[in-house]
Amino acid sequence: MEQTYEYAWIIPFIPLPVPMLIGAGLILFPTATKSFRRMWAFQSVLLLSIVMIFSIYLSIQQINSSSFYQYVWSWIINNDFSLDFGYLIDPLTSIMSILITTVGIMVLIYSDNYMAHDQGYLRFFAYMSFFSTSMLGLVTSSNLIQIYIFWELVGLCSYLLIGFWFTRPVAANACQKAFVTNRVGDFGLLLGILGFYWITGSFEFRDLFEIFNNLSSNNEVNFLFVTLCAVLLFAGAVAKSAQFPLHVWLPDAMEGPTPISALIHAATMVAAGIFLVARLLPLFRVIPYIMYLISVIGIITVLLGATLALAQKDIKRGLAYSTMSQLGYMMLALGMGSYRSALFHLITHAYSKALLFLGSGSIIHSMETIVGYSPAKSQNMGLMGGLRKHVPITQITFLLGTLSLCGIPPLACFWSKDEILNDSWLYSPIFAIIAWATAGLTAFYMFRIYLLTFEGHLNVHFQNYGGKQKTPFYSISLWGKKGVKKNSYLLTMNNNESTYFFSKTKYPIDKNGRKMTRPFMTIAHFEHKTVYSYPYESDNTMLFPIFVLGLFTLFVGSIGIPFNQEGVNLDILSKWLAPSINLLHQKSNNSMDWNEFLKDAVLSVSIAYFGIFLASFLYKPIYSSLKNFELINSFVKKGPKRILWDKIINGIYDWSYNRAYIDAFYTRFFVGGIRGLAEFIHFFDRRVIDGMTNGVGVISFIVGEGIKYIGGGRISSYLFLYLAYVSVFLLVYYLFFLTF
């Protein structure tokens, strides 16, 4: 086992050859590299699969042995300072490694088809592989310096992937917004790291915890300064995990391709903030007020994310706010000290949300055959509806992910979210009420998304629910100028062909994005060469990852279900996390009161079903039709109370749709204030600073010109003026200095 751990340092570097070789190939052999571009997708999946197998093996070793492993190389700069680089393999590392690799592999397979039409196909896979390297380096880091280096690389990859379609101004603005917002948190993280190094003299996690605990027990630290440093460290996690008030970048990050949303903004990168807080939890636990601050930020984010998701029309933005809310649950659990519950929900949410994002990508992919490449239309739930009969496999898996996120048993998120809800009662009744109420809101907005997307009729063909026909479907090309071609091909395979990884037939890249190229796994067995008036199911290459993630959503919750082992109720996750739990809680309790669990489960499921019922009542097609014909309104007495109720509903809708006006506030006061300050500084620099220097030059020039004209060019005049000046100076000197 020791030899296995010794080779763990290679984990982050296994996916690195892909971006390096793609970059070198595009520089040295651009034509050949583009011709064999499918090869890079296969290599990306293969290398990440190797990392996944290695990570699973390490996890099995840890479950059996309950141990840590750390290896450090020291770079001694002088006698007083040295930099240590190494890797740490513990339960938290192995959990994150498995999450990154399993979700990453599914996303890469999915992306081969989803991005097949895109001219930036190679660039996409280079970015994704480099992101995997950065994220794996982050979770295996043994000290704060390495964490910060890979933290910044992850931020760079996020910037590149959000702005992948940088020719679109909206995407360019979104990546800049994400970059700047994260820089605020990263600056705080850097200051916090330097502050704790100044206190303890070490960047290594285990040394840092031990030294700080000794200093704290002897009252040798300034707790006000320590609290400030801890808040600065936490600021980095707040920005990366889209917690209030640095959450504003996450919805705009949906401007990137949908596979990016599934990997980075659902399962891995936004979980980096949760990972950092979990890694530093032994430090935060001994600092006054910081744990309470973490829980307060978490509960605010839980409620804010859920309320902002209520009125979103863009399917990806709705899922983004859902992600923000669920990350708030994890942060709340960490603030309460529920280490196991937070990581359990991190695991279950990652698979469920990745399933939902890939499902939304399949929906968007099918809608583009009707509305063309226009994110404002293909992602608009108001133009969807009735997709259940057109994309049945996507509908089933999307429903599975929706039910999981709602907390319906026996799906994954039910087990993890219930633990957080139960722990919240023991921590604070106010926090518990908010958390339980938000569970109902989660069920409401998730089923709102599901019903608007899959139930009823395809709204792109109708102006309203009454059935009035609209104009023909849109025709918008990839670049927004030319219309789509009349033929939109699915994958084809003759009877005498077999399934293989690489296609023998070359398909050129169509510039307006509707003629798809074949993916490296071709399983389809039919051919259509017609214009689509309705959406169609995605190719099997996209459905396979969705199906696998659906299986994870069904069964991954079982790792947290206790089983009886030698008279003790123990689950796989608790055994896996035993070393970390013992580090935080010297006396951990593995027993479980099933009666208490069932009572709380009945309450949480009842709240979830109430949210589902409310969403069905408001967004089910039959209600929309009745409301359209004023049948429901005829039973409601119109009066002051009804008018007041309508105003309240409209106010809540506007507040939610406009993102609680937080973005507008930041735009006016921060962005506008900084721009105003920049304009004032520019004015002061040009008019005052430059005016002073230019004024001295102008005055000197005028005086010189005046003297030049007075002189006239005659030597006798120069001598006369010289003698006159000398006489005046002598007279002044005599009158003032010699007299007094």
Swiss-Prot record:
NDH shuttles electrons from NAD(P)H:plastoquinone, via FMN and iron-sulfur (Fe-S) centers, to quinones in the photosynthetic chain and possibly in a chloroplast respiratory chain. The immediate electron acceptor for the enzyme in this species is believed to be plastoquinone. Couples the redox reaction to proton translocation, and thus conserves the redox energy in a proton gradient. GO terms for biological process: ATP synthesis coupled electron transport; electron transport coupled proton transport. This is NAD(P)H-quinone oxidoreductase subunit 5, chloroplastic. It is a multi-pass membrane protein. Its EC number is 7.1.1.-. NDH is composed of at least 16 different subunits, 5 of which are encoded in the nucleus. Belongs to the complex I subunit 5 family. The chain crosses the membrane at residues 9-29, 40-60, 89-109, 125-145, 147-167, 185-205, 219-239, 258-278, 286-306, 327-347, 354-374, 396-416, 425-445, 543-563, 602-622, 718-738. It catalyses: a plastoquinone + NADH + (n+1) H(+)(in) = a plastoquinol + NAD(+) + n H(+)(out); a plastoquinone + NADPH + (n+1) H(+)(in) = a plastoquinol + NADP(+) + n H(+)(out). One of its GO terms (molecular function) is NADH dehydrogenase (ubiquinone) activity. One of its GO terms (cellular component) is chloroplast thylakoid membrane. It is found in: Plastid, Chloroplast thylakoid membrane. PANTHER family: NADH-UBIQUINONE OXIDOREDUCTASE CHAIN 5 (PTHR42829:SF2). Keywords: Chloroplast, Membrane, NAD, NADP, Plastid, Plastoquinone, Quinone, Thylakoid, Translocase, Transmembrane, Transmembrane helix, Transport.
